[in-house]
Amino acid sequence: MASRNPPPQDYESDDESYEVLDLTEYARRHHWWNRVFGHSSGPMVEKYSVATQIVMGGVTGWCAGFLFQKVGKLAATAVGGGFLLLQVASHSGYVQIDWKRVEKDVNKAKRQIKKRANKAAPEINNIIEEATDFIKQNIVISSGFVGGFLLGLAS
C-alpha cells in the first residue's frame, strides 16, 4: 500500500519529495483504468481477440510505415539535394574539397563507431532479447504491425 510521505522538514533536502503510488489500489478505485488497460497486465493475447489484435497492429504499423516513408523521402531529398549542390559548387570552383582530409576524418569516425559498438554490445543484446520475447508473446499483433508497416511504406 502507498503511504504518505512525512512533512518536508523531516528530509535532509527540502527540494523535492516523492510519493509512491500503488497502481493496483489506484486501479481498484478508478474503474476507467480497468476499462482502458484491462484486468490483466499480461500479453495482448489475454486481453483482446485475434481480429482486434490484427487490426490494432495493422493500423499502427500502417501509420508508422506511412510516416517513415514520408520522412525518409524528405531526408533523402535534403541529403541528395545538398550533395548535388555541393558537387556543382565544387565543379564551378566555389568550393575546394580536401578529399584526403575527408577520407582521414571518415576513417577516424569509423574507428570510433567500432569502439563504441563493441562497448554497447551487451546492452544491445539485452534490448534484442526483450524485443524477441515481446514479439513471441504477442505474435498476432506483431505480425499485424509488420504487415501494416509494409503497406504504409507502399502507399
From Swiss-Prot:
Domain comment as written in the entry: The YXXL motif mediates the interaction with MAP1 LC3 family proteins MAP1LC3A, MAP1LC3B and GABARAP.
Cross-link (Glycyl lysine isopeptide (Lys-Gly) (interchain with G-Cter in ubiquitin)): 119
Membrane topology: Multi-pass membrane protein
Residue intervals on the Mitochondrial intermembrane side: 69-74, 155
Name used for this protein in its record: FUN14 domain-containing protein 1
A Pfam family it matches: FUN14
Family: Belongs to the FUN14 family.
Modified residues (Phosphoserine): 13, 17
UniProt cross-references to PANTHER family, sorted A to Z: FUN14 DOMAIN CONTAINING, FUN14 DOMAIN-CONTAINING PROTEIN 1
Presence of the UniProt keyword Transmembrane in the record: yes
